[in-house]
């Protein structure tokens, strides 16, 4: 019986650079293959070749699908064959309904009139297949990201998909939404639909995959049954070396208190009867990494947004720096007090995509490069930019390159460089490694550790508990806007943190574990 998919000796070059170099892979019907590799390894390029985003003739090699050679010139050609790709950036029209999105460009007609009734019934059936209980007439923009992801899958099922490519599908999803998505993929597998799954989250890769294919520097490193590979083996194949200690295991010299927060309360920006943060108090010390853990909606992000003057709703409470009360009503006041923040949503709040890397890095610190008569000191600015790029190992062909063209890891390091140009005493990192590969994560962890050695106090928020536990000296556990526990991190486990988050008492507990 032939394979569902064979990609034979695929090579795709851009000028003299081979983004994909002689890569071959096979896939069976009803099989889940995870494609792993660092950013820039060639994964996305290979999938764009498969889906004819790069058309036949623009690459070398051969693609066989369901026994026939695939010579597609447009993504519509591959969709007609039963191949669909869902990108991390969803291709839905937010102002249109679920039904309108599902049939966009493929509307059903009867006697020359839109067959709305049958489209509605079909849409309902497709939504039921992905376990999404929403009315087809709901505007897509009113749905959460997890629900939108399921609409994309339902849309693919409506096109009789036989092979579904999912590129970083859970990067912006909650743990619950991720669990639902993985269940849907298992259901698709049981119905004979094959999946190619691209993710940096190796726990998901291990949980969902039948086979794992690793690509590094455009080359095929190996394809093995998932059961034969540990996460450490996958990492070693991806980066070409073993990361024996993902989190820097170095003791921190914790100094005096630099920040104290007392009775911080923040209300929902629209529904002012709801408290997003409820009477939160804590302290932070020089040279300390304070992790904040909790389920999505626990109030973690809202807490640090208040500290940085970025919260859009009403809040109250007292903030002390070096024991002195300070007023922080906006980001400028926070930066003046020595606070810098890497935001949760890098693309929305951290960068200006159309501007160059250098412009993004210096945007918040232009006064440092302003000389007499308010003239910009270009030479000094360029010198500091070069130094920052080198120190943080930001890979870019030019400081003037649009930052949107960098990989996620390099964008994040550029945002971090922007913060460090402010010479902060307190650095807030909200989801610092979201959507970036394991090698870039390792570099960012080393950077955080180096900053702490310079006596900078760091607050880390992450939805990945291993990250919080691997980095932090102390962990605040939040639930429903309140601090449920303040835990000293001595071999602290994920189970202990989750138990604290779900504990019914509303008082904070100081626990040394």
UniProtKB/Swiss-Prot annotation:
EC number: 7.5.2.10
An MF annotation (GO) of this entry: ATP hydrolysis activity
Keyword Membrane: yes
Binding site for ATP: 37-44
Pfam families, per database record: ABC_tran
Function: Part of the ABC transporter complex XylFGH involved in xylose import. Responsible for energy coupling to the transport system.
The entry's keywords: ATP-binding, Cell inner membrane, Cell membrane, Membrane, Nucleotide-binding, Repeat, Sugar transport, Translocase, Transport
Naturally occurring in which organism (per UniProt): Pectobacterium atrosepticum (strain SCRI 1043 / ATCC BAA-672)
Signal sequence segment: none
Family assignment from sequence similarity: Belongs to the ABC transporter superfamily. Xylose importer (TC 3.A.1.2.4) family.
Classification via Gene3D superfamilies: P-loop containing nucleotide triphosphate hydrolases (3.40.50.300)
Reaction it catalyzes: D-xylose(out) + ATP + H2O = D-xylose(in) + ADP + phosphate + H(+)
Membrane topology (UniProt): Peripheral membrane protein
Name of the protein described by the UniProt record: Xylose import ATP-binding protein XylG
SMART domains: AAA
């Amino acid at each position: 019986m032939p394979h569902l998919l064979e990609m034979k000796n695929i090579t795709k070059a851009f000028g003299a650079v081979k983004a994909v170099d002689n890569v071959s892979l096979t896939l069976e019907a009803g099989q889940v293959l995870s494609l792993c590799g660092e950013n820039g390894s060639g994964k996305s390029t290979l999938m764009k070749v498969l889906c004819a985003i790069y058309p036949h003739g623009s690459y070398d090699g051969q693609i066989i699908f369901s026994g026939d050679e695939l010579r597609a010139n447009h993504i519509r050609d591959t969709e007609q064959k039963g191949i669909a790709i869902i990108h991390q950036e969803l291709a839905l029209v937010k102002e249109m309904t679920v039904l309108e999105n599902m049939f966009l460009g493929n509307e059903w007609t009867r006697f020359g009139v839109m067959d709305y009734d049958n489209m509605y019934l079909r849409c309902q059936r497709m939504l039921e297949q992905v376990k999404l209980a929403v009315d087809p007439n709901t505007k897509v923009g009113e749905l959460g990201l997890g629900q939108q992801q399921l609409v994309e899958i339902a849309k693919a099922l409506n096109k009789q998909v036989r092979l579904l490519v999912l590129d970083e599908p859970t990067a912006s999803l909650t743990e619950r939404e991720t669990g639902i998505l993985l269940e849907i993929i298992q259901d698709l597998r049981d119905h004979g639909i094959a999946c190619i799954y691209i993710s940096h989250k190796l726990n998901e890769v291990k949980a969902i995959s039948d086979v794992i294919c690793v690509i590094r520097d455009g080359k095929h490193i190996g394809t093995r049954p998932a059961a034969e590979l540990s996460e450490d083996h996958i990492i070693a194949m991806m980066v070409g070396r073993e990361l024996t200690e993902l989190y820097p295991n170095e003791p921190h010299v914790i100094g005096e208190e630099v920040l104290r927060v007392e009775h911080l309360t923040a209300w929902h920006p629209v529904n002012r009867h709801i408290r997003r943060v409820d009477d939160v108090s804590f302290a932070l010390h020089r040279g300390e990494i304070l992790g904040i853990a909790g389920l999505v909606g626990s109030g973690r992000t809202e807490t640090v947004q208040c500290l940085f003057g970025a919260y859009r709703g009403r809040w109250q409470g007292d903030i002390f720096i070096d024991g002195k009360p300070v007023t922080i009503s906006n980001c400028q006041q926070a930066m003046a007090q020595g606070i810098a923040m890497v935001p949760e949503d890098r693309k929305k709040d951290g960068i200006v995509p159309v501007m160059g890397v250098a412009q993004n890095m210096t945007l918040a610190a232009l006064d440092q490069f302003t000389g007499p008569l308010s003239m910009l000191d270009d030479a000094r600015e360029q010198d500091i930019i070069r130094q920052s790029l080198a120190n943080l190992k930001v890979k870019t062909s030019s400081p003037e390159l649009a930052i949107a063209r960098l990989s996620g890891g390099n964008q994040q390091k550029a945002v971090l460089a922007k913060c460090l140009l402010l010479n902060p005493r307190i650095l807030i990192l909200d989801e610092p490694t979201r959507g970036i590969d394991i090698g870039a994560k390792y570099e960012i962890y080393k950077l955080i550790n180096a900053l702490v050695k310079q006596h900078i106090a760091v607050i880390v928020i992450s939805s990945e508990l291993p990250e919080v536990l691997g980095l932090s000296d102390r962990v605040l556990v939040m639930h429903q806007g309140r601090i449920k526990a303040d835990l000293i991190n001595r071999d602290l486990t994920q189970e202990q943190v989750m138990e604290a988050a779900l504990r019914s008492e509303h008082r904070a507990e100081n626990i040394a574990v």
